[in-house]
């Protein structure tokens, strides 16, 4: 029994060590439009040696539409060039937002559970309707385990605020803003009810 606990502790520490480091991922263009090819360039840190031992690496992009509750996973094989891993992808036409992780199928770099994110833009250069809202929802900490981002309600409120500034008629974003503000204590129960009635 003690041996099992000891092994579990060691494995837990090892897992935490793997998760405490993150490489860097650059996505270009910075503000991609619908149908535009997105270039990925990943640089691993020395601490990612265990992940690199089982190459080749691939990127998994979880693409969100404004309507669907769950994302679509898109896998991209990465090719090693001059110490960097590169690849390219075109996201589905109805995608508004995506988060990315890089790995070998067993071990993934999730950027310390923050992932890397891509907001799709329209022809005017603005985030597509729903992009900031999906970025906010990703921070609720309620996505399926393979793409669960660390929760951050302060950042979620910032993204919801951006969404309602760009798209003041997005009722779902307004509803979520009130709901999160109430759960963080920024709004009282009565204040939240009053704002719900205004929608």
Identify the role of each PLM range.
Residues 8-18:
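Bacterial N-terminal signal peptides
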Residues 1-6:
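Positively charged n-region of N-terminal signal peptides that target proteins for export
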Residues 21-199:
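Glycan-association/targeting regions that enable binding to alpha-glucans and other polysaccharides
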């Amino acid at each position: 029994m003690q041996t099992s606990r000891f092994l579990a502790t060691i494995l837990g520490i090892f897992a935490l060590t793997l998760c405490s480091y993150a490489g860097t991922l650059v996505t270009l263009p910075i503000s991609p439009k619908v149908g535009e090819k997105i270039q990925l360039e990943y640089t691993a840190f020395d601490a990612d040696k265990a992940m690199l031992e089982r190459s080749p690496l691939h990127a998994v992009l979880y693409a969100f539409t404004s309507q669907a509750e769950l994302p679509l996973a898109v896998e991209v094989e990465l090719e090693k060039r001059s110490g960097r891993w590169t690849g390219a992808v075109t996201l589905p036409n109805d995608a508004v937002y995506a988060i990315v992780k890089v790995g070998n199928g067993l071990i993934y770099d999730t950027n310390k559970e923050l992932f890397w994110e891509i907001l799709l833009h329209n022809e005017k250069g603005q985030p597509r309707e729903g992009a900031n809202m999906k970025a906010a929802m990703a921070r609720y900490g309620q996505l399926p385990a393979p793409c669960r981002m660390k929760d951050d309600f302060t950042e979620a409120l910032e993204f919801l605020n951006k969404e309602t500034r760009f798209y003041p008629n997005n009722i779902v974003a307004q509803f979520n803003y009130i709901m999160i503000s109430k759960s963080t204590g920024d709004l009282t129960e009565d204040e939240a009810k009053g704002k719900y009635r205004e929608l």
